[in-house]
Amino acid sequence: MKVGIVNDSALAVAALRRAIALDPAFEIVWVAGDGEQAVQLAASHTPDVILMDLLMPVMDGVEATRRIMAATPCPIVVVTTDLGRNATQVFDAMGHGAIDAVDTPTLTESDAKLTAGPLLRKMRNIGRLVAGRAAPRPAITEMPGTLAASRLVAIGASAGGPAALAKLLGALPADFCAAVVAVQHVDEAFAPGMADWLDSQCALPVRVAAPGETPQAGTVLIAGTNNHLRLLGSNRMAYTEQPSEYLYRPSIDVFFESVVEYWRGQAIGVLLTGMGRDGASGLKAMRDHGCLTIAQDQATSAVYGMPKAAAAMGAASEILPLTAIAPRLVQACCSVRPPPG
């Protein structure tokens, strides 16, 4: 797996080299000292993954991500020394198509393997994604529903998702009459900051879903751990380690499939921009179950992977530009009465 590094710090580059050397499957093919050089190298020697710093001279990582994803798209992981302090820039980069974010590994010998672990796990997942070796989806088992009838909008997003979620959720009215639950591929250390950022962009309250919480109309819940978020028959949200075979944690497919299993009110599935196929089979299960299902169109997707997979398998009953999704949700959820409980 060919790796490009974009970082102006010699110490950070040395730490990344040491971390990557722990896995012989990875090969560093170039190192860029700023975003402008990275854009040029990505165009001439496109790697399998780029490890992108944020704060650099000449051109920062956000602009470099935007240009690379527009010209020669490939998986980009933001690697920076302080995710929390650089949260705004991380969200901007993910809005332009960066697939994930992680702290820079340390160079200290005693901590090298420990701090390299999160980065290497993300890179291995990307390698499986690029190779098309995502784990097969287990069959859905129909189970008796116990949730009270209500309206639920289930949303999945990956690369480019934070910006897409901000636009979609920001266009929903404060009195939106359905519960909203979103699964965005992001590390658990970063989820609370993303929820706070989305909350500042929307009229609806946004927060990380807590174990045992019940989805409520007019509130947005965001998956907040590296386990799967799902509905259970107790009318509450839960985080579970199983199923273990899914490439992504949290998995959009797992959440969508739990909606099929347990939600007996009106449900709508929405699959936004993202790399790979996560969410496509779950969206198909929702459509087969009689739910309205929406996939973001190619023109407005930062990365047209997950919505493309959904469209190809007939999972989306409607394919819409991002700006049309919120009005469609309002029309579908708020212009009709919910089914009787």
Swiss-Prot record:
GO terms for biological process: chemotaxis. Residues 146-331 form the CheB-type methylesterase domain. Its EC number is 3.1.1.61, 3.5.1.44. The keyword Phosphoprotein applies. It catalyses: [protein]-L-glutamate 5-O-methyl ester + H2O = L-glutamyl-[protein] + methanol + H(+); L-glutaminyl-[protein] + H2O = L-glutamyl-[protein] + NH4(+). The active site is at 158, 185, 278. It is found in: Cytoplasm. It is an enzyme of class 3 (hydrolase). It comes from the Bacteria. Residues 2-119 form the Response regulatory domain. Disulfide bonds: none annotated. Belongs to the CheB family. This is Protein-glutamate methylesterase/protein-glutamine glutaminase 1. It comes from Cupriavidus pinatubonensis (strain JMP 134 / LMG 1197) (Cupriavidus necator (strain JMP 134)). The lineage of its organism: Bacteria, Pseudomonadati, Pseudomonadota, Betaproteobacteria, Burkholderiales. The gene is cheB1.
